[in-house]
Amino acid sequence: MLLNNALLLLLLALAVAAGWTLGRNGLRMDLAGRAQLPSQYYRGFNFLLDGEEEDAVDAFTEALAVNEETLDTHIALGSVLRKRGEVDRAIRIHQNLLKRPQLTAVQLHQSHLELARDFIAAGLYDRAEQLLVDLATESSEFTATAQQHLLDVYEAQRDWSAAVAIAEALIASAESEGQSAAGQGQPASQLRGHYLCEQAEAAVASGDQAAARALYEQALRDRPRDLRALMGLVRCALEAGDATLAMEYFHRVMDSERRCTPEMLDLLRAICAAQEDPSLYMTSLERYYNQQHSPLLALALAEELSQRNGREIADEFLRATLNQHPSASVAASLALNALRSEDSQPECHVLDQLIRDDHGYQCDHCGFTGKARHWRCPGCRHWDSIHYLGGALEQVNGR
């Protein structure tokens, strides 16, 4: 609806601009010597009054000459069409601009950039890449913008090495100007770290653990607390059979994240199992729970206490936890244990599944929610914007 309104407003502006330009530049005269507007202008108004916006667009763009004064109107129209999904028509408008030699170099470069955006929207990444590479080379004014759009292209193509190179170019350029480098509205160093981690994960998939470790370490140079790289190094150390090194990295993981998440708990279990120390998992849970009082850690610790010392000891711990750090999920776990003592199997099963499955993640940027962590939001495509919420029970409880 907003885009439709924007198009209508733009069409009105286009009509006014066309009339003004025609009036300023002189009208054609009929046989009687009277001023005459071109037929496309009248056709455009008729289409607009009939609600036929698409035909009105074509008529007004034919009537409105392309020059320095009308360029912004043409570009704005193409942008609205692109956002409406009418990419082919946006491409035609912007290609038409590039055929106009009377435009200045800056205006041609601006048209160049808009056409590249059209190609990206259409999924024509090879054509967009060539335009953007040329633009970054030819125009210092548009270099950074072109490079930022190249990141869009390389991300879509999963060409992570090319993306790393562009991110590094943005960082170097910003440093030379004493500024902070940004790409797609995020720090270029942050993007570079994720691109390196993507390369590392590809190396893991191909069985090259050494290359993966090197790439994860490279990602940590600029961002020593990068959670993704640290978790990757934990997995690499486990794969190499070095549980001690894995635990060292895991300590850094816990220091970098404000609350324990399910995948972090899985890593801890794997590390402790690899070290073959029966008490290590329990002591680690106690250590981390004392640091952050996470309900997830409390439940894991209670489960371990139940297996080692019996359910009564576990319930005592949960009751103490509930008094000191109120939590709906801890209360639900206590209720589950009470149901078990009454042998209420159906209710036990339902509540047990609720507690085990009760966790979620949310994007800070667009609000996307899911059950698993994504390093890049599937909704808004921002990197590193999804964080652990805890469970629905914790959200109801306001924690």
Report the location of each language-model feature:
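Residue at a conserved register position within TPR or TPR-like alpha-solenoid repeats
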Residues: 47, 81, 119, 154, ...
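N-terminal signal-anchor transmembrane alpha helix of single-pass membrane proteins
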Residues: 1-31
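Flexible helix-coil transition and linker loops at the boundaries of alpha-helical arrays
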Residues: 29, 98-107, 138-141, 173-189
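Structural register within alpha-helical repeat arrays
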Residues: 43, 77, 115, 150, ...
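Alpha-helical segment of the N-proximal tetratricopeptide repeat
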Residues: 33-69, 76, 82-86, 92, ...
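Alpha-helical repeat scaffolds
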Residues: 90-99, 125-135, 162-172, 209-217, ...
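TPR alpha-solenoid repeat register
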Residues: 73, 107, 111, 145-146, ...
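Short coil turns that delineate tetratricopeptide repeat
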Residues: 68, 102, 106, 140-141, ...
